[in-house]
């Protein structure tokens, strides 16, 4: 007997997004790195299935599991605001394969200045693409803004790494291994706000509970961007803090000293082990669809809401991005 899918809401989350565990399960699903390998035609099929489900025209014989799988592919590859297919490298599902390579090499090649500069540049190039790909698309970003953001973040990361390398020359070796994390954290504090500065200037689009646009709020933008910065630093922290401790001990073992050529691949592999868990955990720290009390909004926006709605509106909602 076929399941009745006429009332199936494909946009309803499978897990409770009001709880941390529910959000982690959700992001484990859509940041699955295996989806990066899914062919384009299958992604296009997923989009068609999602759109048909939204219109209530699901093909006969379709199973619920097929719709869940289609939604997983759709969420992993298509932007939540525009519905456009995102570039592969910028998708959150590419965070594990892309991040593990860059993190592993940043942690391995931290001693020489050219290596530090090169890998910080690679990392910031990757971050800039991810930030742009996962931005709140309701707030357009100009090419000039992207360029300024990219240059500023890269300069910050390199300056932090180079400066701390010089300061830690006489410090214990382990301290020097933590320099890449300090550079990454500092750059995230610059890169994300700079890339999304338009939202801070003009405000982020806020909606009512029925998804009707109300206006734009700079305060909401500041909250959303701050949460994204915290999430990104949290994503990198365990691997970039604990791996140096582990490698510092492993490199004292004789058999590890004999195979120095494998040190970098080992750090890449271990970085992947951390990221495969930390990407969904960090993304799930805060709800993607944020809820904000109207009383926190700008006074003029509060007045607009009071004039537009007869009944009191307690909260507004907005997509904070990833």
UniProtKB/Swiss-Prot annotation:
- Which InterPro entries does UniProt cross-reference here? Mtc
**Transmembrane residue ranges:** 100-122, 142-164, 174-192, 228-250, 265-287
Alphabetized GO MF terms: monoatomic ion transmembrane transporter activity; transmembrane transporter activity
Record membrane topology: Multi-pass membrane protein
- Record's GO cellular component terms: mitochondrial inner membrane; mitochondrial outer membrane; mitochondrion
One GO term under biological process is: serine import into mitochondrion
**Protein keywords:** Acetylation, Amino-acid transport, Membrane, Mitochondrion, Mitochondrion inner membrane, Mitochondrion outer membrane, Transmembrane, Transmembrane helix, Transport
Chain positions found as N-acetylmethionine: 1
Query: Which reactions is this enzyme annotated as catalysing?
Result: L-serine(in) = L-serine(out)
One Pfam family matching this protein: SFXNs
Source superkingdom = Eukaryota
Subcellular compartments: Mitochondrion inner membrane; Mitochondrion outer membrane
User: Belongs to which family?
Assistant: Belongs to the sideroflexin family.
Q: What does this protein do?
A: Mitochondrial amino-acid transporter that mediates transport of serine into mitochondria. Involved in mitochondrial iron homeostasis by regulating heme biosynthesis.
Extract the NCBIfam families matched here.
mtc
Name of the protein described by the UniProt record: Sideroflexin-2
